[in-house]
Amino acid sequence: GRIRRPLGAALSIGTTKITKSEGSNRSDTSGFETVDTIHRLKNKIQIWLPDLKYSDDLAAIKYSNAPNYFNTATTAIKTMYKQVGPYQIDENGLLKSGVIIRHLLLPNMLENTLRVIDWIADNFEPGQVLFSLMHQYIPCGRAAEYPEINRVVTAEEYQKVEQYLFNSG
């Protein structure tokens, strides 16, 4: 079997405060940025908050019209990490710098989420990045066109992912 590394403060991100203080700028991103865009922001952003929505490129195309999403997003995230390094928390418990990878759990897409978690565990050591698992998906807009995602995430789906996170380290 594969050895899994813990993801650090995987589910405790809600207790981490993110600051926008003097010298600490953050960037909420879709995760679908080009490396060139990230390079242009070097030394301007201390806290990156990229989304990593899909590990499945077919789902990325189907739901977001984003071909080559996973490769583009993971390359962007690695580039962000190279710029700011491991996350740093100051003496007041505030996040000063780092990368928080956000992932929204979607209904009927458990494998997508597990592969996102695996990618993070395979590419970062404990203490390097933070992970924010979000489960507040609310179907709206064109979601009605896709019955498989036209509902909220169940407690059972969330618990399975939560258990996977805790067992992965």
Regions found by a protein language model. Give the residues of each.
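A broad detector of short, well-ordered amphipathic alpha-helices
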Residues: N71-T74, Q159, Q163
